[in-house]
Every structure is written in C-alpha cells, then in structure tokens.
UniProtKB/Swiss-Prot annotation:
Transmembrane segments: none annotated. Belongs to the ABC transporter superfamily. Phosphonates importer (TC 3.A.1.9.1) family. SUPFAM superfamilies: P-loop containing nucleoside triphosphate hydrolases. Its main location: membrane. It comes from the Bacteria. This is Phosphonates import ATP-binding protein PhnC 2. The lineage of its organism: Bacteria, Bacillati, Bacillota, Bacilli, Bacillales. Residues 3-242 form the ABC transporter domain.
Length: 244
C-alpha cells in the first residue's frame, strides 16, 4: 500500500469537526475519486495527507512512513514525493508556463538556486517533455495568465508531475471548468499518472466524471467514509443517500 490512513480525525479550533474518523488504504497506481457533498470533509481529508491541514489525531502512512510524525527536513522530503493540484491552479501568473512547471523541482534545489531560478538543464528538458504530454509544448514561453482555465490547470498537473511524485492529490481540479475542459484535464491526468505509475487521489463534485475516470471511488459524508468501491458498484441510490 502506498497510502494507509488510520483513525484520522480533524477538529478545528472553533470546534467544527472536519473529519470524524477515516480509515482507508490505497494501492500503488490507483486513481481514487473522492466524492461527497460540500462540507463533508473531502478537502480536509486530502489536505491532511500532506499536512497542509494538521490532523487532530490519527496516522497517515505514505510508503510506510507516518507523515504525521515528520518534522523539518523529514517533512520536506516526504512532501517532495506528494504532488498537489489545486482548484484555482496556484500558478505564478506573470511567469511563463515553463517556469511554473519548473517550480515543481524547487524541493530538490537549494534555497539560493531556487530563488535565482537556476534550474538544471535536465530539469528544463523534463519540464518541456511534460508540457508536450499535456498538449502545451507550444505555450511554454507564454505567461501563465494568457492561457485558458483548462490550459492553466494542465500546467498545474505538469508542475505536479515535474516533482517526480509517487502520489498526486488533486483538490476539485475541474470545479471552475466547462465540461470539455474538465474532460481534457482528467484525461491528461489519468493518462500520465498511469504511464508514470503515480497514485492519484482526486476530489470531485461531478459524480459522472468521477465514475468515468476513477478506478475506485470513496464517498465521504459528515466526515466519515460511507462508500468505498468501484464505479460500477456505485448505485444511483447510494449517490442519492450520499448527497441528501
């Protein structure tokens, strides 16, 4: 198992319960879609995995190591292997597409070299290769804010791939996109992650897209897992119960 979550709980300082208790395991190479209503705890769960949200209790084992116990250098090392794709892209808009993808390599560089943008030639070649795979090679030198929303999200995927991660977390990556752009983004994400053997966990509101692209689906409601199975096993009744 590349990821194992045991007794994960999150209570915010104001008393809001983000996660009641989650236990699950994820195999290497799987594409998992996490579905559920707004406020169910999907984003809290996803962001707990790389400690963007600090769990209240529980354990999260990434490739056998508990990231909840990691501090300082060890935490940075573990985060290098966990790529993140954000709902609102999180790109540096005034920088080029290529520079944004190269930022996926910053975790492997010294602070000085990273700050000066002194990337190794092999990093640049790798970034251009990834851009080609997401259909954006010809946009490499454009500013990120000159691209459409769907294209910007593909840059976000390319940046995550450039980290050479073993795990990618994608938090509502198509929430702001039209259906065609959404399908393109999920297609590129699934294809490249399959080719590279990267495990992917994606939060989605759109159940039909989740069923089309996921190997396995996890339904979260009120901070707990209420469904865990294949897309074929997810019935209309289960969806209705999940979103009631």
């Amino acid at each position: 198992m590349i990821l194992r979550v045991e007794g994960l709980k999150k209570v915010y300082p104001d008393g809001t319960v983000g996660i009641k208790e989650i236990n699950t395991s994820i195999r290497r190479g799987e594409l998992i879609s996490v579905i559920g209503p707004s406020g169910a705890g999907k984003s809290t769960f996803l962001r707990s995995i790389n400690r963007l949200v600090e769990p209240t209790s529980g354990a999260i084992f990434v490739e056998g190591e508990n990231i909840c116990n990691a501090r300082g250098k060890k935490l940075r090392q573990m985060r290098r292997k966990i790529g993140m794709v954000f709902q609102h892209y999180n790109l540096i808009k005034r920088s080029s597409v290529l520079q944004n993808v190269l930022h996926g390599r910053l975790g492997y560089m010294s602070t000085i070299k990273g700050g000066l943008g002194r990337f190794h030639e092999s990093d640049t070649k790798r970034a251009l290769s990834i851009l080609k795979r997401v259909g954006l090679e010809e946009q490499a030198l454009k500013r990120a804010d000159e691209l459409s929303g769907g294209q910007q999200q593909r840059v976000g995927i390319a940046r995550a791939i450039a980290q050479n991660p073993t795990l990618i977390l994608a938090d509502e990556p198509i929430a702001s996109l039209d259906p065609t752009a959404s399908e393109n983004v999920l297609h590129y994400m699934k294809t490249i992650c399959q080719e590279e053997g990267i495990t992917t966990v994606v939060n989605l509101h759109q159940v039909e897209f989740a069923k089309k692209f996921a190997d396995r689906m996890i339904g979260i409601k009120a901070g707990k897992i209420v469904f865990d199975g294949t897309p074929r096993e997810l019935t209309d009744y289960t969806v209705d119960q999940l979103y009631q």
